[in-house]
């Protein structure tokens, strides 16, 4: 397996911050650093990686509140999410104060991502899928070779992302899961934004919202 995966739960919301390390090069990416920077850096150190970029699935504070500080500290770029997520990122200072997260900075990602784009972590390629519904500019990262997806708050073990936030859309979320994620294969393991990992096949069998019987 060319990619090495570590998961560090961060913030009071226990958000799954993923650390991805290319085993061939040692290059690493941090996905969705919502907070607890020292905890994340300890995880990177334990995995033996050298962080080259930060990847973001979407703009909610528990996924990206520490992105700017971490990027500045490590002098690395931020890639993602899709540009419709500017709506949420611009609210970070207000949202983080309101929910007791300190005071996060507004930032402009170095690269907005679109459906069909690719991002590299060392020699490992991740395809980008735009999966709106939970938020308008949410993206999913898929490593075809390792059969691994980082899905943020699109899909969970036994559930799906909330769609009652501003600019959320339930029909869009269901459509994105069924038309973009399911075709990738039942054997694909995924890291959700919260809770345990699962596979697309398991969710197709048992998920009450997007399973084949739903």
Where are these regions (language model features)?
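Active-site HxH/HxHxD metal-binding segment of metal-dependent hydrolases
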Residues: 36-120, 124, 205-213
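Conserved beta-strand hairpin/beta-sheet module of binuclear metal-dependent hydrolase folds
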Residues: 2-47, 140-152
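Short Gly/Pro-enriched turn/cap motifs at secondary-structure boundaries
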Residues: 8-10, 102, 108-110, 130-132
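Short catalytic-loop micro-motif centered on adjacent basic/acidic residues
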Residues: 29-31, 53-55, 128
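Metallo-beta-lactamase
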Residues: 94-95, 118, 124-214
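Conserved S/T- and glycine-rich ATP-binding loop of Class I adenylate-forming
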Residues: 20, 57, 131
